[in-house]
Each structure stands twice: as structure tokens, then as C-alpha cells.
Amino acid sequence: NPDNLPGERKDPYTIILPPPNVTGTLHTGHAIMLAIQDTLIRFKRMQGYKTLWLPGTDHAAIATQSVVEKKIQKEEGKSRHDLGREETLRRINDFALDAQKTIISQFRSMGASLDWSRLAFTIDEKRNLAVRTMFKKMYDDGIIYRGYRIVNWDPKGQTTISDDEIVYQEEKTKLYYLTYG
């Protein structure tokens, strides 16, 4: 916590850790990113800055749901429809919390100088309220609106997904022409 650092500190220097998804464990890319940010925050602290490095994890809703559904299908041969909404949500939440504990443990074992007193989870009450409040404000201001648009539909997940989540696959297929008249 920068408020507990010894001596007189000058300007603040803050890094918000890009929150890893709770879909599994950390990989080499996370470790590299952590090492770079840790080096920056420690260097600025040695220069006398009031440093703050905020930790957190991302619930990654659709991705986490997909991982859990695949696990349930593999281990039990059941779908989310077989389990029902409440049981599926409970299992997704349990998985996410377990993965979050593992990720935090990995961060700590790497010696990251994060301010653990300010740990955030993108679906915790404080963040959830902030997102809903801002979403409503943006809707009221006309920035977010409902319109007729082409969307990416995931038939397996039965939901819309963003362009970033699409895996494009080129295929050679036939093209048919229809002539009218």
C-alpha cells in the first residue's frame, strides 16, 4: 500500500495489472508481463515515487462458462441443460474462485509487489455495481443503444460473442449463383 511506504514520497505512479482470466492457471506470457511490471514499479519506488500496483482477476464469463461446460461434459457426460441454471452457475462460480486462488498464489510465489489489500475481481460487488451504473448512464446518454445489427451468434453457447472471440477459418467451398427472371 503506497500510504504505508516510509519517507516522503513525490508524485504517484500506478499500474493496474491487466487481470488474467480465471479460466485456468498462469502461463509464460503472464510471467513475462508480471516481471516487466514488477521491475517498473520497483524502479519507480526506488526513485521516490508513491507507487501502487493494483492486482485483480477477470471472471471472463463466456470463456469460463465454456471451460466449465467442457469439463462437466467430459467428466459427467452432462450438459448445462441437464444440470439446470442454478447448479451450472454454482459450478462456474466454484471453478472461478478456485482458479482465482491458484492465480493469486502463483503471483505471490513469483514475489510480485502488488498491493494485496486492494485485490479486485471483475465480478465482485463493487466492480459489478460500477459497470451497471456506467452502462445505465451510457444508455441514458444514448451512447449504448439497441439497434438492428448483424451479430456473431454462437450456436453452441446460445449467445452473442464479440469479434475478438471469433476464430476465422478459411475454407474452399462452392459458390452458387441464382438467376432470376
Label every PLM stretch briefly:
Residues 1-181:
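N-terminal, positively charged nucleic-acid-binding surface of large information/translation enzymes
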